[in-house]
């Protein structure tokens, strides 16, 4: 729900505005926060992100959906951009694999495995920027495949590849700062290959394009410098990356993350054995690490580097920080498996079995099915006024209940300085004889009951 608030409410978080705390606000106030009151006024989400910790492009995408479909409502108006991004990502991944491998079934299987995986399905229903970041990551891979194939064939790179690289790098930088880490490994390894292959002219154009994209992103959103280097998340990430006092814990955490991600595709050991066995068979057939195999190895190496660095920098061991590498890994595995039995390519469809089975063993955590009992419990009181007490330590924490607030007659959020006094003042300033609901964020139930009595 923070996504909708940051997309729609001028000034960012309403709880930080003067006069909000310790006063009553009608439910219509919160309802307005959940929709675009000024269609296509992109200065609202763009400027709001200056006080947040993320860049603004995804919020502008949500704002576009709200402006185009004002009657669609929650959650569909937020899910629509996700669905578009993920379906487009599957289509571009198919085109990427088809171009790289050259055959239908490996490309179709790669796109299907990616699209149907637990992690990608999770991002489809999680109203944050990760679906857009995945699409941008796949477009980045497509541009590299086009460039790599042209160079391999001794041809001049197509002119369109340069604006493509520029646009996707700029867009990614304006979507999630972790995309820059993905670019660092993918582009860094590709740049090393260009130098090793003595493609100096192409390498120069490549470097200029990538850095020009970063400069353009900075020019469009200069606040990103403060976000990355002096913002709360940025300073936390850099401090964690350069803290070398707990390397053993870092190694343990990487193992946990790898197992978490692999579980969404059917398990780490299953795919480790499959890929290792395929590599051994191909080696014995005379296949070596060159051509498509070298490109696939680069994708896996870039993905491994990304996991290692993000695990050090990210605040949580959550799959959403890593889904951008899923397409790269799937593409690399597709390259390897497609070489095994080119005359029996439909057997590749068996890869879907563990991926679909993973929905049973490691289900989508972003459906929030545990919220169903809460909705049922609130059904009879959803329109009553509410007083909100908050012990989280930051004023915007209760914004998580924004959709509930929008249905209520009115809401009064305590300032947190003296909850007992705030509760007393709220009760005395409004006729609540018809009853009211008391929210206690991070309160013990008995403590909250005693405070109310």
What are these regions (language model features)?
Residues 64, 92-95, 112, 116, ...:
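Specific aromatic-rich, kink-prone transmembrane helix
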Residues 353-409, 415:
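Membrane-embedded, lumen/periplasm-facing catalytic core of multi-pass transferases
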């Amino acid at each position: 729900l923070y996504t909708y608030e940051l997309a729609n409410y001028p000034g960012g978080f309403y709880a930080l505005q003067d006069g909000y705390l310790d006063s009553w606000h009608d439910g219509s106030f919160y309802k307005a926060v959940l929709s675009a009151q000024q269609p296509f006024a992109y200065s609202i989400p763009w400027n709001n992100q200056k006080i947040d910790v993320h860049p603004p492009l995804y919020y502008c995408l949500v704002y576009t959906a709200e402006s185009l479909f004002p009657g669609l409502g929650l959650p569909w108006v937020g899910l629509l951009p996700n669905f578009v991004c993920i379906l487009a990502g599957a289509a571009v991944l198919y085109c990427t694999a088809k171009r790289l491998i050259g055959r239908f079934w490996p490309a179709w299987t790669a796109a299907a495995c990616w699209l149907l995986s637990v992690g990608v399905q999770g991002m489809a229903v999680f109203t944050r920027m990760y679906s857009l970041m995945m699409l941008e990551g796949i477009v980045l891979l497509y541009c590299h495949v086009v460039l790599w194939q042209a160079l391999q064939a001794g041809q001049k790179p197509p002119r369109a590849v340069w604006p493509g690289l520029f646009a996707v790098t700029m867009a990614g930088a304006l979507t999630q700062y972790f995309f820059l880490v993905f670019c660092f490994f993918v582009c860094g390894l590709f740049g090393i290959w260009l130098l090793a292959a003595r493609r100096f002219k192409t390498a120069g154009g490549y470097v200029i394009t990538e850095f020009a994209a970063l400069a353009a992103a900075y020019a469009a959103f200069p606040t990103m410098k403060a976000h990355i280097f002096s913002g709360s998340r940025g300073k936390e990430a850099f401090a964690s990356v350069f803290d070398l006092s707990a390397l053993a814990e870092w190694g343990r955490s990487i193992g946990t993350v790898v197992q978490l991600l692999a579980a969404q595709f059917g398990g780490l050991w299953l795919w480790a054995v499959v890929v290792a066995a395929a590599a051994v068979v191909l080696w014995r057939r005379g296949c070596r690490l060159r051509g498509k195999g070298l490109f696939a190895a680069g994708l896996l190496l870039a993905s491994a580097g990304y996991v290692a660095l993000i695990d050090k920098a990210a605040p949580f061991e959550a799959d959403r920080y890593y889904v951008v590498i899923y397409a790269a890994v799937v593409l690399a595995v597709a390259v390897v498996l497609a070489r095994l039995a080119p005359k029996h390519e439909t057997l590749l469809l068996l890869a879907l079995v563990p991926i679909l089975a993973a929905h049973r063993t490691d289900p989508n955590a972003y459906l929030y099915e545990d919220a169903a009992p809460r909705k049922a419990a609130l059904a009879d009181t959803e329109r009553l006024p509410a007083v909100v007490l908050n012990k989280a330590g930051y004023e915007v924490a209760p914004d998580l209940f924004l959709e509930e607030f929008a249905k209520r007659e009115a809401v009064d959020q305590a300032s947190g300085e003296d909850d007992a006094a705030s509760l007393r003042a709220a009760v005395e300033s409004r006729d609540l004889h018809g009853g009211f609901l008391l929210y206690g964020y991070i309160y013990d139930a008995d403590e909250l009951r005693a405070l109310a009595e």
